[in-house]
Amino acid sequence: MTSTSDAPQDPWHDIRPYQDDEVAATLTRLAEDPELLSALTRYRLPRLSRMTPRLSRTLASWAIKRETRDVTSVTAFQQRIAAYMQRMLKTSTDDFRVDGLDRLDPGTAYLFIGNHRDISLDPAFVNYALYLAGRNTVRIAIGDNLLKKPYVTDLMRLNKSFIVPRSARGKRAMLQAYHKLSSYIRHSIQDDNHSIWMAQREGRAKDGIDRTDPAIIKMMTMAHRADNRHAPLGEGIEALRLVPVSISYEYDPCDVQKARELKAVSEDGSYNKSEFEDISSIVAGITGHKGRVHLRFGTPIDRSFDTPEAVAAEIDRQ
């Protein structure tokens, strides 16, 4: 069992996923969160939520407590999610195929870097593939721009997500935040032997062009370079056991919304999201028809790539 440490011994306490001894308090908090309860009733009980909002929230709270009454660990929570994934696959996909996972050592932690088409499902499909293969699930990198509500933060961190800083102000603050993130990634891979999933770029590829941002590669190796200033970049990459992962969906449930955003950026130069647009995209991605889904795991990138651009190109090639 994992346990919570005080901040000095736990330097990543504010960005890391929740641990087993934090599960019970988090679930209690979620079952009493009025914003979460209102959001659930709007989607599952729309008429009742309009007519008797207090009753609908009470029912939602009771449902959360009933569904999670035996959940006392992160693993148990994810086992519940696996059941929902199975149901989602049956109702919204025609086929789910996985290639390449059998070539990776089940006892080794990897830093999976993947293309990004869906806010929640890209890492969810990676996790489900690992779950079906009897392997440990990944810790998921998620931008703090998605964590605008406390209940969203709780749900994500309960599902083994860690926080990527995007809202830090000022160059110095951003560098400190990214160094902290880089050190956590290294700690997870090398000390905890726990795999990670991270997107190849900031935000989804709304235009369908999957291209790795070299800045992501620089961030990943910051901690290694801080300890070994003259070490080649390839050494840090090899130590992280970086493995490209690609996912493709036959149909994208969010294609209209993505096209609308691209059109606005093209014509107006910017796009302003509505308050709950990301949440709506998550729901649409989960419930919408996806057709055939194909997930492919690549091979670990070795130390022969000596620049962030070269590493990014190899990720894109695979």
Pin down the residues of each PLM region.
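Soluble catalytic domains of membrane acyltransferases
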Residues: I81-D306
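Long, compositionally biased intrinsically disordered regions
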Residues: P308-Q318
